[in-house]
């Protein structure tokens, strides 16, 4: 079979995996309640930002322990809920909260597939790794069941280190800033970036 035909078939298979991965996460999101503490925070933060605007969000005495990078997404979700009269803790509201992290998970799956394909070609190992990333129980639990937003900061963080490997230092640093603006846990990767970035620049 010509290599171009194989590549087209594999690209179609990748799209099927991506769509299925997002669909599974959204079905889980609709069917489960999520982690109640974080769910209530996400809903309240979105409502506050949507109604009061960014200038009044970090107000004295108001609990908000997330940086501002992801808050506009929560505000957009709040706006959609108000527009269509959707309850935040209902199935549709939960799907809206899980939508962006699920799409970011799909972006991570595509990135893993592209890296694996460069290293291993159009092989069974490449698709096994892609499938594992798509349906890893940890990712499904985090995004689909708990409704966490980790996918939204893991994607730019993974892209950051991929760009570092390819010696594209400025875009890598910018993407690390994006990840850090979404969730402070990106600081855990800071030491690695602090070593890799200066070493790469010096080697260049």
What are these regions (language model features)?
Residues 188-204:
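Perimembrane helix-loop-helix junctions
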């Amino acid at each position: 079979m010509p290599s171009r035909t194989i590549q087209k078939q594999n690209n179609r298979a990748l799209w099927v995996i991506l769509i299925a991965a997002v669909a599974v996460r959204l079905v889980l999101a609709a069917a489960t309640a999520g982690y109640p503490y974080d769910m209530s925070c996400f809903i309240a933060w979105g409502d506050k930002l949507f109604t009061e605007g960014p200038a009044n969000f970090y107000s004295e005495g108001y609990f908000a322990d997330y940086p501002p990078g992801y808050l506009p997404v929560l505000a957009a979700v709040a706006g959609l809920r108000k527009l269509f009269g959707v309850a935040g803790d209902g199935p549709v509201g939960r799907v809206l909260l899980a939508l962006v992290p699920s799409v970011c998970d799909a972006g991570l799956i595509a990135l893993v597939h592209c890296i694996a394909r460069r290293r291993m070609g159009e092989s069974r190992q490449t698709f096994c790794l892609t499938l594992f990333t798509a349906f890893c129980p940890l990712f499904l639990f985090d995004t689909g069941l708990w409704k966490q937003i980790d996918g939204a900061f893991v994607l730019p963080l993974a892209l950051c280190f991929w760009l570092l490997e390819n010696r594209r230092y400025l875009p890598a640093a910018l993407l690390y800033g994006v990840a850090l603006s979404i969730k402070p846990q990106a600081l855990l990767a800071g030491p690695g970036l602090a070593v890799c970035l200066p070493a790469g620049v010096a080697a260049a």
